């Protein structure tokens, strides 16, 4: 996942925990030199994923969630860095939707409210209103259109909000100022990030939750492969015997 490589790992590994507004603090003191000139001294304090780490120069802290984590140097090329930023953002959003959907449907299934399949078997369900082939074709068309428009906005920022960009008259509702954040009343109905001062805070919250969701999805994959049950089932089993029903014992049991 390019996501983790670009931005870093949040949580307990951070050197300093701060709000986005104080991720980078600059203190400039001016001292008069003997000749009457001004000698500025700049001290820059960065939150990093590892104490004492010197972040690479291309990760200067301006990106949301940038804690200087790029051991492979994938973002050294500016154009590649732009692409990885968008890749992380999209994967984060899909992961957040996926985690929420899995937990919600699993809760309905385990409580008996709805007769639903466990999440990793949902793709095998047959629907009466359409065949599997029809659903695949429809998904290709809809997702293909959306992803094509997103890529075009990445190549030419703001182009999809212009009149005549073939968006069924919704161009005015896509007034975002940068790729990945189309904004407007369609995708930002509450206007949460219209305030420039708070926009970075919302971006940081989104990327932190997105990274957490991607780790959760990875956990769901491993969980399903090892236990062949859903996350709610595993949680209930763990709570029934917290000292003996843990991830470590489960992994050792499955390998023995």
Swiss-Prot record:
This is Photosystem I chlorophyll a/b-binding protein 5, chloroplastic. The modification N-acetylalanine is found at residue 33. InterPro entries: Chloro_AB-bd_pln, Chloroa_b-bind. The lineage of its organism: Eukaryota, Viridiplantae, Streptophyta, Embryophyta, Tracheophyta. Gene3D superfamilies: Chlorophyll a/b binding protein domain. The LHC complex consists of chlorophyll a-b binding proteins. Homodimer. Heterodimer with LHCA2 and, possibly, LHCA3. Can substitute to LHCA4 to form a complex with LHCA1. Binds pigments. Element of the NAD(P)H dehydrogenase-photosystem I supercomplex (NDH-PSI). Disruption phenotype: Slightly lower NDH activity in immature leaves. Smaller version of the NAD(P)H dehydrogenase-photosystem I supercomplex (NDH-PSI) supercomplex. In the double mutant lhca5 lhca6, drastic reduction of NDH subunits accumulation upon increased light intensity. Binds at least 14 chlorophylls (8 Chl-a and 6 Chl-b) and carotenoids such as lutein and neoxanthin. Chlorophyll a 5 binds at residues 205, 223. It comes from Arabidopsis thaliana (Mouse-ear cress). GO terms for biological process: photosynthesis, light harvesting in photosystem I; response to cold; response to high light intensity; response to low light intensity stimulus. The N-terminus of the protein extends into the stroma where it is involved with adhesion of granal membranes and post-translational modifications; both are believed to mediate the distribution of excitation energy between photosystems I and II. GO terms for cellular component: chloroplast; chloroplast thylakoid membrane; photosystem I antenna complex. Chlorophyll a 4 binds at residue 209. Chlorophyll b 2 binds at residue 93. Chlorophyll a 1 binds at residues 69, 88, 211. The gene is LHCA5. Chlorophyll a 3 binds at residue 206. The chain crosses the membrane at residues 94-113, 129-146, 212-232. Light emission at 684 nm upon excitation at 410 and 470 nm. Disulfide bonds: none annotated.
